[in-house]
Structures are given as C-alpha cells and as structure tokens.
Amino acid sequence: NATCAEELIFTSGGDAVNESVTLAKLGDRASLLARLDCSPVGNMILEDIEQHINTSLLVRREDCRVPSVVVAIQPDGEHYFLVGPSQNYGLEPEDIDFSVFERTKVVSAASLYSLGEMDGEGIRLVFRKAKACGAVTVADLNTDIKSLGPDAFHDLYKDIDYLLPSYEEAEYVTGQSELPAMAQFFLEKGARHVVIKCGSKGAYYQDADETFQIGAFPVKALDTTGCGDNFVAGFIHGLLKGWSHKKCVTFACATGAVNAMSYGGHLGVTGEEQILEFLKKNEI
C-alpha cells in the first residue's frame, strides 16, 4: 500500500536548529552548540544550516549518528513524527568551549528533557557558566520521553532567567491546570520570568512584577512543526532588541504564527520586517 503526499521537503530541524536559524533570519547572530555526525545526511544538514548560523561550534564525530525524522503533516497542520535510530549524538560538557560565553548575550537550552547526557548536571554547568559571564539564560521544555520525571530540573530553575514551556509541558511538571498556578510554581522554584505557550490561545506571561496574556493570531496553519521554537526565537529577538516583555511576547506569538503558514520547522520566517508587517495587518 502507498500513500501519495502533496509535497515532500528535505530540511534540517530539531528545537535548537529551528530556534537558531529563525534567530538568524530575524537579524541576530546565532551559533549552535551540538554534535553532528559525518555521514552524508550530516553533511547535508551542515550545508543547510551554515547558510544562516555560525556552525564553528558544532562537534563533528564519526562515532555519532543524528536521527533522521519523517514528519507527516495532517490537513489541519498537526504533525506526527517517525524517528529513526540514533547513536551518541548528545552534546556533553567537554564538547563546549565555555570561553564563547564571554561574548554571548543569551544562552538558550532547546530543550530540557531532550538534551541527552546534558539533561542534569551538564545543563546546570552550562547555565552557571553563562550567568557568570553575564549572559541571559533561556530554556524551553519538551516531552519527557525518557521518563526523567517532573522533578528532574527543580535544581535548575534558579539558574533560568526566562522559562518558556508549553501548556502541556508546564502541566506535566507542575501538576497544575491553571496558568497563574503553573507560573507561580516555576517562580517559587527560582525562575525569574515564565512564559507559557498556549497554542491556539496565545501565551501567558508572569514574573514578580507583571502578569498578562496575549491572544493567538488567527491564521490558516499548514504545519505547526517548530512553531514553539520559532516563538522562543521571536521572544529572544525581542529581548536582544530591548523591548518590553509584552512586546516580546506579542512578537513571539506572531513569529510562531508566521511559521505555521509554511511547511518545515524554520522555513516560514524570512526576517524581522516580515513579522512587523504581519503585526500591522493582524490585530488580536
């Protein structure tokens, strides 16, 4: 049996790739810290992303295998993943040149629960080194596919300036169902600012000084792959521009919405002006 697809696209992806490439398209200088194998697929990934970001910090290794993923996009834009085998592709602390943090404004973990061996003391070390150099720390969450448990990062939140989980991820970690209670949980654990991505309901922001919710932009979604990563990239872009938190969240919502109108995890966004023009034409 065979199923005919309307379109097939080969592209790079993954949380950190989507986030860094979108940041670069928005006009920021972005580097990727990751392992990448030396296979033909690894070479194609490198060729794809080096058009946009600094790849000098990538660690190419013969003994690792980055997983290939088939993403099936449904008519409503939702997606299903078929993940291939992988081996030894998780970044480790010894792979990182921490001196780069001395000239870095933001260090982002994309995403907790999917960092391999770094999910633990490794990412704690990264964030502590980053903060010691004066960088802002940002973290997204992912599904707990390795069953690390909801308490896995309770010692890390105090080293996170901006935590940006999805509603479902926040619900899993906190055991709460109301947005204020979710955010308060993370704030009490030490996170300084919390942004909860709520999909079709927009995003919720809370810190010690302000609380607000921004609605979602109504768009026809072709593919929601990477929309959360694009949201984070849009938010970080706003931070780097020195915008207010409300403007950062609004821009982030728009960035995710624009991404949803194209196929692929980082192919929809072309630049800051595109997002600003989208904001002019769309009110929420």
List PLM regions with ranges.
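Glycine-rich phosphate/adenosyl-contacting loop at the front of the ribokinase-like
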Residues: 1-33, 40-50, 221-222
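A glycine-rich helix N-cap at a beta->alpha junction
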Residues: 48-64
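Gly/Ser-rich phosphate-binding catalytic loop and adjacent alpha/beta segment
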Residues: 59-68, 89-91
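Conserved phosphate-binding/catalytic loop of the ribokinase/pfkB sugar-kinase fold
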Residues: 71-120
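Short beta-strands and strand-loop turn motifs
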Residues: 82, 104-112, 134-141, 164-167
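Conserved phosphate/ATP/ADP-binding segment of small-molecule kinases
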Residues: 124-127, 131-136, 143-213
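Conserved phosphate-binding/catalytic region of the ribokinase-like
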Residues: 129, 179-284
